[in-house]
């Protein structure tokens, strides 16, 4: 499992997942970490302490350092370790991590503390770049994956051509636009690109996004949704 947004418990229930052996974090931002207490719900049995389960929590070194600085995350996970329901482990950039037949490698991105992950299963490869891809320059080892999962990026205008991101808006300096995402997809050249981190701020319906898929069919786009399953 990658990251723990605040609604992660609902997602796991929907997919009927009741055991998570490995949890990987991409960065410290609250929308990716503030559901971490799900580990208590998954692993702790207060009436039968011996029945508790353990989840390995994998953190790239730079993410671990941010956990020490932000949101009390390091304290949270120290608490989970004391309860015996988590084991925090650090990984370095490019280090091969083998989990259930899948090899994962972490790569530092341009924005502070952000991580992309390359997954390999047999000859199949998936690249995850889930947030803050602005100024990211993926190396050649990340090119031509079978699957790319990447943030949608922001839109300057809504579907009626009304401006929703003003020229001086800070989002322009801190976040990648949809056009920047398209350029990244063109550089990476995946077989399929799944767009995620979709915000209601962009004032688009799912049907609007389906139109976007058709408009940019040459980029092999798919717009993600809750419950989407991808064979890998």
Question: What residue spans do the PLM features occupy?
Answer:
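Binuclear metal-dependent hydrolase catalytic cores
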Residues: 1-129, 135-138, 204-232
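Cap/insert and terminal regions of metallo-dependent hydrolase folds
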Residues: 135-228
